[in-house]
From Swiss-Prot:
GTP binds at residues 165-172, 190-194, 212-215, 282-285, 310-312. It holds the Pfam family DUF1967. Keywords: Cytoplasm, GTP-binding, Hydrolase, Magnesium, Metal-binding, Nucleotide-binding. Belongs to the TRAFAC class OBG-HflX-like GTPase superfamily. OBG GTPase family. It is found in: Cytoplasm. Its cofactor is Mg(2+). The lineage of its organism: Bacteria, Bacillati, Bacillota, Bacilli, Bacillales. An essential GTPase which binds GTP, GDP and possibly (p)ppGpp with moderate affinity, with high nucleotide exchange rates and a fairly low GTP hydrolysis rate. Plays a role in control of the cell cycle, stress response, ribosome biogenesis and in those bacteria that undergo differentiation, in morphogenesis control. The gene is obg. This is GTPase Obg. Residues 159-329 form the OBG-type G domain. Residues 1-158 form the Obg domain. It comes from Listeria innocua serovar 6a (strain ATCC BAA-680 / CLIP 11262). It comes from the Bacteria. GO terms for biological process: ribosome biogenesis.
Length: 429
């Protein structure tokens, strides 16, 4: 089964909790705090494995949860950090955050790694909070929660050359005679429903990867037929080989087919028309092919080369393969998803990221004030509410952030209910 798109859930490990402990040894009076820090949780890491070809494994396992870090221990011993959860993906996988639309990683090289969900750090033990004013603190932190994400994986095949054209124009036959690939070939439309890759030897020592892609029909850019399944895989190709049935054996007009395919490529809006395109006039062994080719050439620009071939009789193939190899030598890779091209590989690209507010206040119909925000929620989850000292520290942190003052400005009075995540408390003015 060829699977090229799937949605999964990933959750990095939480950090271990810090510990409140004191050194208690004979002949060591007033030993002081000795609570260790919690260990770091495990990241969720994607690694490219060149042995994989599809995303089919993710159809049966869609939830990936990494391990948590161990809690801190007494005698100032830190908790053990968890080992990263390594998930193998095929070459050409793009990882996209479903909720934000952000492209997290584009994984193309064997062994390439990307952290998809970042683990939480371990909470600090009470030894970390010792000060001259408070040499024996009874507070610690909980571990930081690990990042969780809903992500979409898209597989876009890695090929130098993509064969495009209407169904049954001979794309699969062409790939089968110029490479060792054995795509399914039959006398009906959409025989090819998944991409087929083949390594092609140009005959002069040069070689390249060619992809036979599912046939295209009008409206594919809007998802008609195999639509986006086809166009997704052509995004990585550097050269497009446009195969046309020059015999018109199914009553089609070659020039109209040529224009229709190019229109779909342009409508997909991924700079596909900027890629070099080589026109292949296939089925030249059929009746009317020569006459149709002459008429076709009168309707296109004179500087556009057309390579007449017959994939069945294997004529005209050497000239075509050499032309493709020549074009590849002068064609750079095209960026995906409108990623900015960098002129210098050593250039560092800084992106502006809008800073989120520390907290936001909303009010529900029942009068409850609701606090939200990444920073304030993080402080809340890392607070150990079993210790009075930790609760007092959390209250001081809220006051320093300006939460108390902001609530007053929103009309909060003594005794009003304030909710943060699943926890409710009374506002004290």
């Amino acid at each position: 089964m060829f699977v090229d798109q799937v949605k999964i859930y990933v959750k990095a490990g939480n950090g271990g909790d810090g510990m409140v402990a004191f050194r208690r040894e004979k002949f060591v009076p007033n030993g002081g705090p000795a609570g260790g820090d919690g260990g770091k949780g495990a990241d969720v890491v994607f690694v490219v494995d060149e042995g994989l070809r599809t995303l089919v494994d993710f159809r049966f396992k869609r939830i990936f949860k990494a391990e948590h870090g161990d809690h801190g221990m007494s005698k100032s011993m830190h908790g053990r950090g968890a080992e990263d959860l390594v998930v193998k993906v095929p070459q050409g996988t793009i990882v996209k955050d479903i909720d934000t639309g952000e492209i997290i990683a584009d994984l193309v090289a064997h062994g390439q790694r990307a952290v998809i969900a970042k683990a939480g750090r371990g909470g600090r033990g009470n030894k970390r909070f010792a000060t001259p004013a408070n040499p024996a603190p009874e507070l610690s932190e909980n571990g930081e929660p690990g990042q969780e994400r809903n992500v979409q994986l898209e597989l876009k095949v890695l090929a130098d050359v993509g064969l495009v054209g209407f169904p049954s124009v001979g794309k699969s036959t062409l790939l089968s005679v110029v490479s060792a690939a054995r795509p399914k070939i039959a006398a009906y439309h959409f025989t090819t429903i998944v991409p087929n890759l083949g390594m092609v030897d140009a005959g002069d020592g040069r070689s390249f990867v060619m992809a036979d892609l599912p046939g295209l029909i009008e409206g594919a850019s809007q998802g008609v037929g195999l639509g986006h399944q086809f166009l997704r895989h052509i995004e990585r190709t550097r050269v497009i080989v446009h195969v046309i049935d020059m015999s018109g054996s199914e009553g089609r007009v070659p020039y109209e087919d040529y224009m229709a395919i190019n229109n779909e490529l342009e409508q997909y809006n991924l700079r596909l028309m900027e890629r070099p395109q080589i026109i292949v006039a296939n089925k030249m062994d059929m009746p009317d092919a020569e006459e149709n080719l002459k008429e076709f050439k009168t309707k296109i620009a004179e500087d556009i080369p057309v390579f007449p071939i017959s994939a069945v009789t294997k004529t005209g193939l050497r000239e075509l393969l050499l032309a493709i190899a020549d074009k590849l030598e002068t064609t750079p890779e095209f960026p995906l998803n409108e990623i900015l091209e960098q002129e210098d590989e050593d250039t560092v690209l800084y992106k502006y990221v809008a800073e989120e507010p520390d907290f936001e206040i909303t009010r529900e119909p029942d009068g409850t004030f609701v606090l939200s925000g990444a920073k304030i929620e993080r402080l809340f989850t890392m607070t150990n509410f079993e210790r009075d000292a930790s609760i007092s520290r959390f209250a001081r942190q809220l006051r320093a952030m300006g939460v108390d003052e902001a609530l007053r400005k929103r009309g909060a009075k003594d005794g009003d209910i304030v909710r943060l995540l699943d926890y409710e408390f009374e506002f004290m003015d």
